[in-house]
Amino acid sequence: HMRATAPLVQNITNFVAMNVMANVMLAAGASPAMVHAQEEAAEFAAIASALTVNIGTLSPAWTASMQTAAKAANDRGKPWVLDPVAVGATTYRREVGAKLLALNPTVIRGNASEIIALAGEGASGKGVDAGDAVSQASDAAVRLARRTGGVVAVTGAADLVTDGTRFAEVENGHPLMPRITALGCSLTGIVGAFIAGQDPFEATVAALAYYGLAGERAGEKAKGPGSFQVAFLDALYTLDGQDLARGARIIRP
């Protein structure tokens, strides 16, 4: 469905992720736009099909854009995704995370440490890398989902998705994926593209399975992180609905 509609997705993301994220989204069939200026972020959010917000390289001007864009998306009934990168690492990040959380994201996607920190518990986050297991974040994910009325995806070696009542685990993926910067950030863009006009829970599960399956495909050919990136873009481009139906490893308890 996503390829047929090629949704326009606005991404207020970090400097590290922009290029990788745009290429990942284009390979998948979405239409990414990296629009973050305060003067236009809210106006653009009103016309985009979905919005993603990533707090990786924060600054006050960007924070203002994130809030106005999220409010505009809410006002227009457009879904938006929060990627709370290293949200527990500094006081500033915790403050910004709390402000964005209060705007009730449609989907929150983060690693276990980020989800635990966002829910308000001490987490063993080392910046952007997860020190906590996905299973440890399960309770925090449920609490966050019930607080926002949205979906929470805890991503790691296996992914957990919940909307507070429904649960799914996605087991697709490849060990090289964490070795390449911005692949997690780029996944947030794919989630944004998948949820445009769809049930957020099922669309998020599908997005994670698709992304992980592309990683598995890439891993079959790659000799290391460099060749993996190239093979991953190709896999995102070539995977179709039938491949996803056959290859998705989704557990619903």
Regions found by a protein language model. Give the residues of each.
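N-terminal glycine-rich anion-binding loops that anchor highly charged ligand groups
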Residues: 10-23, 35-47
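Glycine-centered short loops/turns at secondary-structure junctions
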Residues: 29, 76-77, 149
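Glycine/small-residue-rich loop that forms an oxyanion/phosphate-binding "nest" at active or ligand-binding sites
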Residues: 54, 62-111
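Conserved phosphate/ATP/ADP-binding segment of small-molecule kinases
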Residues: 92-167
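Short, small-residue alpha-helix embedded
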Residues: 117, 179-209
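Short pre-catalytic strand/loop immediately N-terminal to key active-site residues, enriched for Gly-Thr
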Residues: 138, 142, 170-181
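Short, well-structured alpha-helical segments that form the helix of a local strand-helix-strand
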Residues: 140-145, 200-215, 233
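Charged C-terminal helix
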Residues: 213-253
